[in-house]
Amino acid sequence: MPASLVVQKFGGSSLADADRIRSVARRIARERAKGAELVAVVSAMGDTTDELLALAEAITDEPDSRELDVLLATGEHQSATLVSMALHAIGVPAISLTGAQAGITTDGRHGRARIAGVEPRRIRAELDAGKVVIVAGFQGVSQAASQDGETTSETTTLGRGGSDTTAVALAARLGAARCQIFTDVRGIYTADPRFVAGARQLSVIGYEEMLELAHQGAQVMQTRAVELGWVNDVIIEVLSSFEDAPGTLIAEDPLVEQRNKVRGLAHDRNVAKVTLVEVPDRPGVARSVFEPLADAGIIVDTIVQNVGHGGATDLSFTLARADLAKAKRILEPIARELGFRELTTDSAIAKVSIVGAGIQNAPGYAARMFGALADAAINIEMISTSEIRITCLIAEDQLEAAVRALHAAFELERPDELGEGTGAVGAAS
């Protein structure tokens, strides 16, 4: 019997061309040679997803969500079959499976479906037959009863980063020893190394800290994947596809309470701010604003309401930049109905966050963060916090300077005194 089962996930940059696909096949073969059973989850090659989306938008400004999911899922189908062919070419038995063939079921929300369950019988049978199983990530199948009582199946996609979620969900359901996420960086860093030359790779980071970093813009891991790993106690390794070097382990960190420090910075350019000026200050108005946005699937982040004067107040909130136009269309008639004086927007902004379990255990973190930004002449427009995170909204053209100032202020280039090998966190936009 094989010693263990390993799930590996390869992102688009790892599969960008035929040479890289062959390199991925060799990496899979090396792991299999150690005696492990292998399931590999693959993203679409390179920029394939963006290219397919652009093609759809060249046909129509508003592609049907069902048809768009069917189209986008083909990118992962292509990768899975090519990786399987590459394995066959070097003598490794393999089979490619779509998300549906792999037993991944989802809810019916096209473009942002959530995994409802995994039935891995087909995967298990192929593993028992001695094959490496290559699964198309980012997708699944929803099932619903039609009007005539028949069950209909529809292809769904999981949203950006959905292949991470596929990999962790399969690792949890199959009882994998670990889930390896191969990407174009070595792991999780204290900040984006493109901004900070001294950014340091982390050897280990806890689920909670990683989840906050992912939520605030660190794009190495998708947030839902981290959540699934945390809930199911899946050990996740973030590794480079292009070099054999130690990565970052995402797992329960027994020293998290003792570290008492900021672990990393995250940033996000995909932000826009909406301000409703002189909103009537009465019960029910906030609901009238935010309920239609929620119904449209728009996620609102930071919310700030000024102290009311003269029966009116200003209400500001942030959302994903891609949702700004839709939000304006929804809010403009509401503004006329409720009597706002003005609706303003700003998309030239960004978020920068400090993250660490130590924030809840010691005073002074907020003061140091705000002081570092002030010393760099960076104005803070909005602030939000959680138990382990402080986020500031700033002008986008000051983002890189902010990241460098905060990295220096919290001395993140220094190794952790409790023990920290080299590893990787804050890469984002």
Q: What is the role of each PLM region?
A:
Residues 42-50, 189, 238-257, 311-312, ...:
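Terminal amphipathic helices with adjacent charged low-complexity linkers/tails
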Residues 1-226, 318, 393-395, 410, ...:
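Nucleotide/pyrophosphate-binding catalytic subdomain
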Residues 247-429:
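A conserved regulatory-domain signal marking ACT and ACT-like small-molecule sensing domains
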Residues 178-182, 236-238, 301, 381-382:
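Short hydrophobic alpha-helical runs that function as membrane-insertion/retention elements
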Residues 229:
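Acidic-aromatic/histidine active-site loop/patch
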Residues 222, 233-239:
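Acidic/polar loop patches that form or flank catalytic/metal-binding clefts of enzymes
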Residues 36, 92, 234, 298, ...:
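Short phosphate-binding/catalytic loops that engage adenosine nucleotides
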